[in-house]
Structures are given as structure tokens and as C-alpha cells.
């Protein structure tokens, strides 16, 4: 919500909210409009790839042109498989910007807007964001050991509204 809705509105951009995802509705909207930014989760990109690969002729040419003309395309909220990233680039000419965030923090990690975007990664911590991996016992993991992502920074929200117990269980210094 923060990245897809609040940020564009804050700078005076307009936002199209298409409702529940239907691949036909998204393709139709993209073809009828001149969007400059598009953000979606990996499952939507997967469905769009499937749809585009079944298109032919002028319809295919139009949708590819419309996606290619966009200034920025982002993927977030889940891991984007490298093969989806590659296929999207082949079909549209767009190099997806993978990012990581959540409702509680907005965006915390990102590949660079300009420069090398590493497929299959969410990039590095944004300015003023500290990130570490922790084990269940709240101990920072050793290098190359899996763990839960922990984020600290000024963008982390303060609390769950009227949910003191949930807040205490979820946040610590």
C-alpha cells in the first residue's frame, strides 16, 4: 500500500487500481493507457507471461510495445524466480526491479534503479536501514546461515494499532 499507492499519490501521480487480478483486465488496461510505472507480485508476472506467449499479431505487438515504453517495472512481496525475470525481459524488453518490503516497513531492500540488477535477489538495504538474519532465539546467524530477516530503521512503523501483545511479540531492539 505504501509503495504502490501512497508514494505515487504523494508526488501527484495517478494510480489505477484494477481490483482482483484478472490477466485479461490487466492486459486490456495496459493496452489502453500510457502507464509509466507498473508494480506486481511474481505470480502476476507469471500469468502475464503465459498470456503474452499465447498472443499473436497486432495484439501481441501492442502489449509488448506498451510494456516496453514504461519507465519502471517492479516486482516485490515474494521471490521472483530468475527464469521469470529473464522471460519477462525477453518478451517486453524490461529489466524488472526486484525489491523487498512489507506492510510494517514499506520498502527496505532494493536492487539499484540504475546499474546491475541481480536476478533472484532483492538487492541491498536502502539508506538508514539495518538488516540482519536471526535464529528463533533472537541471535544473529553466522554468515551463510539461514534465518529470519530483521529490519531496523526510521521507516519501521511503531506498533500494531490497539494490539499491544502482538506488538511486544513482534518488535524488539
Q: Positions of the model-derived regions?
A:
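Alpha-helix capping/helix-boundary segments
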Residues: 44-45, 80, 156
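Conserved ANL (AMP-binding/adenylate-forming) active-site segment centered on the GW(Y/F)…HTG consensus within
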Residues: 93, 154-173
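Conserved short alpha-helical elements in the N-terminal third of ANL/AMP-binding
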Residues: 1-15, 31, 36
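ATP-dependent adenylate-forming carboxylate-activation enzymes
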Residues: 13-33, 51
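Short Gly/Pro-enriched turn/cap motifs at secondary-structure boundaries
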Residues: 116, 120-126, 170-173
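Gly/Ser/Thr-rich phosphate-binding loop
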Residues: 10-13, 35-40, 49-118, 130, ...
